[in-house]
Structure formats: structure tokens, C-alpha cells
Design a protein with these regions (language model features):
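Noncatalytic alpha-helical scaffold of FAD-dependent oxidoreductases
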Residues: 1-296
Length: 296
């Protein structure tokens, strides 16, 4: 058993430690009462800059219980359209729409507003999952790319990426996510993020479906992931390591930076034989399950 007070080195090595030091089999979490209803908003924007400006605003004042940004192919023309998906939790009295969205700069007349039960809100992707299971795309390779970006470079970097991104690059069921996080809320030492008050998670969630009409191959998507990773890293971005970016041991040392000695010491103490999660090649070259066979 470990906690911030009991075996704290193991506790902090497990959080964002990518399975290098222990296997988490049980956790104790504090619970809070769940709301009964959610006022659900989808608000459309013409550009990355317009979306992120409102995202920064609603993050700063905390008006929503949930807020996330996405991009989708523009159904009315070339390129992409962007939207803010947000939720305001309540029990008996619905929130006032004008108070929540009256000062935002979305495209008026395109907003979608609905009320959902809390469970229905949490389970709102179930029908999409069922559809992808029925088509087989749920079981195709998903070479995901996820990175934390400094807020100061997010608009220019994301706009540049999106200007050249096509449906073939992400697959017919691919998803683009973009939303801000407060740096101060992320306290796990091994979770590497930019050193700015506001950072953004930018995710290109690809599906390499061979039958989706022109999607790139998994290898091509992995190569693109690597190229995007290097561009973002050079701007101060950090990999959010849940996806498929080919990485070398040197990359991992660079990724963990000043936390590398702590992770290496914890690995030596708790898994000296190197049994746990070797496929990522973090401590020695090997078959990198997040991409391909890589040298050190």
C-alpha cells in the first residue's frame, strides 16, 4: 500500500510512471454526490483562435462543470469547423443560458442546447461506440497522437497543423480534441507538462481503417505522429503518453528531464529485473509497442 504519506516514492512513481515500477490493483477515491441533470451545450466557432479565446474565458471563471473542444470536417465547405462542448450540472433549477453563454463569441444560430440526465450525459458516446463496433472500425489500429502544448504557442501550432490535416490523415472516424488545463492542477511529478499557467491538450485521434475510403496506413500515421511530436517538442510541448508516438530511450530521458533520476531509482528499487512494461523501451531499447522497433 502507498499514499503521499506511506511509501511516497512508490506513490509518486506510479502516477504517470507508465507502469515502470508497479501495477495499480486498487485505489481509494473520495466520492461526491452526483447531480441529477446536465444542461448540454455545443457552440460552433470558425477558427482555432475564436475557440481558444472562449475556452480560456470559461476556464478562468469556472462557469461550466465540463468543457472540451473538438474539430470536425466542415460539412458546408473545405477545412474544419470547431466547437466547444460544455455542460452545467444542476438538480432542480436549470441554469440561465444567457448567463452561461451570452458573452461568448460562437456563431449565433448554430448553438445546440439540450438537457440530459447525468448518466445519459456520461454515456452519450455509447451509440457512436456501438456504430463503430458494428462497422469494425472500433477494432482497427488507432495510432493516437496527444501532446500538452504551452498556451502561448497553441493557436499558431494548432492552426498550422489543422491547415494541412485531411480526413485521410485521421480516418473517417478520427477525432480532434483541443482544450485548456490549469498547470497548477497537475501535480504528479512524472506528468510532464509545459511550465505555463495555462496549457492545452491537443489530440489527433486517428483510426487506420483499411475500409474507410483512403485512410493512411498505420505506418504512415505513425510517421506523421513522430514528425508532429518533434515539431511540438521543439516549441516546449510534452507527450501525453497514452498514444502511439515512436520513442527511443533517449527521447524518454529527454521527456522526463529532471525527473528521470527519480524514475530510474524507483525502477531499480521496485522492479530491478525490468519485468514491468518493457515494450515502451523507456530504460533500454526494445520492441516499442507505441510504434515500431527502435534503436537506443
Amino acid at each position: 500500500m502507498c499514499s503521499p504519506e506511506q511509501a511516497p516514492d512508490l506513490f509518486h512513481a506510479v502516477l504517470a510512471g507508465l507502469g515502470q515500477c508497479a501495477v495499480l490493483v486498487r485505489a481509494t477515491l473520495r466520492l461526491v454526490p452526483a447531480p441529477s441533470q446536465v444542461r448540454h451545450y455545443i457552440l460552433y466557432y470558425p477558427s482555432v483562435e475564436a475557440l481558444t479565446a472562449d475556452q480560456r474565458l470559461v476556464q478562468a471563471d469556472g462557469r461550466f462543470s465540463f468543457a472540451e473542444g473538438e474539430a470536425q470536417l466542415n460539412p458546408n465547405g473545405p477545412g474544419w469547423q470547431y466547437y466547444l462542448e460544455a455542460g452545467a450540472y444542476y438538480d432542480s433549477t436549470p441554469p440561465d443560458d444567457d448567463t452561461l453563454i451570452g458573452d461568448l463569441h460562437f456563431q449565433r444560430g448554430t448553438e445546440q442546447i439540450s438537457d440530459l440526465g447525468y448518466y445519459d450525459f456520461l454515456d452519450r458516446l455509447a451509440s457512436a461506440v456501438a456504430f463503430l463496433e458494428s462497422t469494425g472500425e472500433w477494432y482497427d489500429p488507432h495510432p493516437w497522437w496527444n501532446m500538452f502544448l504551452p498556451g502561448s504557442v497553441t493557436d499558431s501550432f494548432v492552426s498550422g497543423v489543422m491547415a494541412n490535416l485531411t480526413e485521410a490523415d485521421i480516418g473517417a472516424s478520427g477525432v480532434i480534441l483541443l482544450y485548456p488545463l490549469r498547470r497548477g492542477d497537475l501535480r504528479a511529478p512524472l506528468l510532464r507538462v509545459p511550465d505555463e499557467p495555462v496549457i492545452f491538450l491537443f489530440s489527433v485521434l486517428r483510426t487506420a481503417a483499411p475500409d474507410s475510403g483512403g485512410a493512411l496506413s498505420p505506418d504512415a500515421m505513425l510517421s506523421s505522429n513522430r514528425a508532429l511530436f518533434e515539431r511540438a517538442r521543439d516549441l516546449g510541448g510534452y507527450d501525453y503518453p497514452i498514444g502511439s508516438i515512436p520513442m527511443t530511450t533517449h527521447d524518454w530521458r529527454q521527456h522526463f528531464g529532471p525527473q528521470w533520476p527519480f524514475l530510474a531509482a524507483a525502477r531499480q528499487r521496485y522492479d530491478p529485473a525490468g519485468i514491468l512494461t518493457p515494450g515502451q523501451g523507456i530504460f533500454k531499447p526494445g520492441p516499442n509497442k507505441r510504434g515500431t522497433e527502435l534503436p537506443g
